From Swiss-Prot:
GO biological process: spermatogenesis
Keywords: Phosphoprotein
Name recorded for this polypeptide: Spermatogenesis associated 6-like protein
Highest taxon above the source species: Eukaryota
Family of the protein in this entry: Belongs to the SPATA6 family.
Annotated region described as Disordered, given as residue ranges: 286-305
A cellular component annotation (GO) from this entry: sperm head-tail coupling apparatus
Bias (Low complexity) ranges: 286-301
One Pfam family linked to the record: SPATA6
Length: 392
């Protein structure tokens, strides 16, 4: 089993009374022990030199089996020849201090000891030296300590978290506060404002708030103008989907988008579609009371584009019924809505006389459908029985 020798050398001072060195350069002490060479730091050349340093030497003797064999190996030291030279002359032997060619072989004669038999041996070798710039580690450490000293010290004892964790937490909190329809997008200022305009009804969430996926208004008003007065790129599918889900609850923002006829001018297209909920109502007429239909008809406004501002006031006292409790088409034209039809009639007439309507007189489809809206009767419609289905 190999043995390891560990030597710890402590150097306290070097004294030489009455001696003054002619040179004023710094001096150091070098120790060579067990094939290892260590040096001390540099000190001023004035005796006594107080060093106060320690050196550690380690060596493994693989062939030793006991400490006595190690002692014998330490005594086996016979110096035959040596060569001593300063580092400058050893690396740059030329007078002009120019490095020798890397492939050029150098030859130096060694000095023999007293017991060496024969002439001095000669060493053949070559050296290659490079001087390059490097980073001074002590200087960087000084700059880092100086930079850390300028930082303000925190007096709070709370745990410190990284900055990205706080943002993620804020993002997660913001996403939890918003509806599910907006969580797929980044919570930027523009996206939040865009969501408020598209789906204003989902912002005021109550305890009994429910979104029925089967709700479908009988009339769909689409914006077919290519000029896009609001300057927003809105697809037809997204516009139709947002109007299906809009129920205009107590919305605090004065949003007036395509739900107002002031922005549509003469480019209004009315598409008549049957109400699928009438079929469900006719099948379940035996278990539902007609008095419930009258209560819900005054509060529900199917077409958000034709009922604009009136829907904000009428939906305040309404609840969220199921798919079977949706109002019938004929109940939407209750005698109480006569004033609404008058307002629509006056607004459409003002749209036709506007400058925008005169620019689009060449569009036959838009003109014919607007005339169809004007010629519709403003008198209240009759109440039909539950089993009748009528489409307007």
């Amino acid at each position: 089993m190999p043995l390891e020798v560990v030597v710890e050398l402590q150097i306290r001072a070097i004294s030489c009374p009455g001696v003054f060195l002619p040179g004023k350069q710094d001096v150091y002490l070098g120790v060579y022990l067990m094939n290892q060479y260590l040096e001390t730091n540099s000190f001023p050349s004035a005796f006594p030199i107080m060093i106060q340093e320690s050196m550690r030497f380690e060596k493994v003797f693989e062939s030793a089996v006991d400490p006595g064999a190690v002692v014998d190996l330490l005594e086996m030291w016979d110096e035959l020849a040596y060569y001593e030279e300063n580092t400058r002359d050893f690396l740059f032997p030329e007078p002009k201090l120019t490095p020798s060619h890397p492939r050029r072989c150098r030859e130096v004669l060694m000095k023999t000891a007293l017991g060496f038999p024969g002439i001095a041996p000669k060493i053949e070798f070559s050296t290659r030296t490079a001087i390059r710039e490097c980073v001074f580690l002590h200087r960087n450490r000084f700059l880092e300590e100086r930079h850390e000293s300028r930082r303000p010290l925190s007096t709070s004892h709370e745990p410190i978290f990284p900055l990205n964790t706080i943002k993620m937490k804020l993002k997660e909190n913001n996403l939890n506060r918003l509806p599910k329809g907006m969580q797929a997008r980044a919570p930027s200022q523009y996206s939040t404002r865009h969501f408020f305009q598209d789906q204003p009804a989902q912002l005021n969430l109550g305890n009994n708030f429910k979104i029925s996926g089967g709700s479908k208004p009988p009339f769909v008003v689409r914006h077919v103008d290519s000029a896009k007065p609001f300057g927003e790129n809105i697809s037809e599918h997204h516009l139709r989907r947002s109007r299906r889900k809009s129920k205009f609850s107590d919305f605090p923002f004065p949003t007036r988008r395509a739900s107002s006829l002031d922005s549509l001018a003469a480019n209004v297209k009315v598409i008549k579609e049957p109400d699928e909920r009438i079929v469900l109502r006719s099948d379940s007429s035996s278990c539902l009371d007609s008095s419930q239909f009258g209560k819900s008809s005054s509060s529900k406004q199917g077409d958000a584009d034709f009922h604009g501002k009136a829907s904000f006031a009428t939906y305040q006292h309404s609840t969220s019924p199921g798919p079977l409790d949706q109002p019938l088409l004929r109940e939407r034209f209750h005698p109480g809505s006569q004033s609404t039809w008058k307002n629509i009639h006056e607004r459409v007439c003002s749209l036709l006389t506007s400058h925008r309507a005169q620019l689009h007189q060449n569009k036959e489809d838009s003109t014919s459908e607007v005339n169809y809206i004007i010629e519709r009767p403003s008198y209240p419609l009759k109440k039909y029985s539950l089993h009748e289905q009528r489409y307007f």
